[in-house]
Amino acid sequence: MAYNYRFAILLVLLSATVGFTAAALKPPVRTLNGNITLNLIWYGKFTPIQRSIIVDFIRSISSVTAAKGPSVASWWKTTEKYKTGVSTLVVGKQLLLENYPLGKSLKSPYLRALSSKLNAGGARSITVVLTAKDVTVEGLCMNRCGTHGSKSSSVNSGAYVWVGNSETQCPGYCAWPFHQPIYGPQSPPLVAPNGDVGVDGMIINIATLLVNTVTNPSPEAVSACTGIFGSGAYPGYAGRVLVDKTSGASYNALGLAGRKYLLPALWDPQTSTCKTMV
């Protein structure tokens, strides 16, 4: 029992929601709902395919296209059960910073400074800063995989989210269950649905932090369900998920352009349970 408890604590650390703890020390994010502009800043080198995986995920959140199975849009609808109500995300401006203008080692204040480079949508916006696999960020792999907060103390500044690509730095910490965990039972990792351990891991963390941002100040939306991706999950086991018959990849949500994603369970405030897609 003591071992299971310790491992459960470890899984909390493995989750991107550790970024929430860090974010809690920053100015609170104002409540966001309605139409929200989501700007993207790509810091470092991302391939066009990597960018499309992430952009397709964001566009899938508010898609009205019916999917033949569990979808990204239906996963997001759980956020409507929170006091913030309906939130529709629209991709705004994108900025590519492939020449590392601030270097390849970033301190935490740099993330907020970078997010201020795009302000489309004003107070009703979230700017997502994404750092490439060769960029080290203060705290990445040590106590967080991403974070979120307000761009500044101004109520009109909007929010920001940061997520790093952990592929070459700590995939067992920030890209589980697509990589064996750093500690605990070494069960075989799941096959990443888009064939990219780093980016598919980023999707989990982006999803986590976007939900935490729009449901703020209700941190339990994802953090209460850490490490759960399907029914029957327990520490070290992601749960029962769907498997692509051709690639063997694991997923639980369908997106636009035929994309498949693995998304974390969300806390359903109406049923007081962790809601999984499958």
From Swiss-Prot:
Residues 1-23 form the signal peptide. The keyword Secreted applies. GO terms for cellular component: apoplast; plasmodesma. It is found in: Secreted; Secreted, Extracellular space; Secreted, Extracellular space, Apoplast. Glycans are attached at residue 35. GO terms for biological process: response to oomycetes. Keywords: Apoplast, Glycoprotein, Secreted, Signal. It comes from the Eukaryota. InterPro entries: EXORDIUM-like. Belongs to the EXORDIUM family. May play a role in a brassinosteroid-dependent regulation of growth and development. PANTHER family: PROTEIN EXORDIUM-LIKE 4 (PTHR31279:SF43), PROTEIN EXORDIUM-LIKE 5 (PTHR31279). This is Protein EXORDIUM-like 4. It comes from Arabidopsis thaliana.
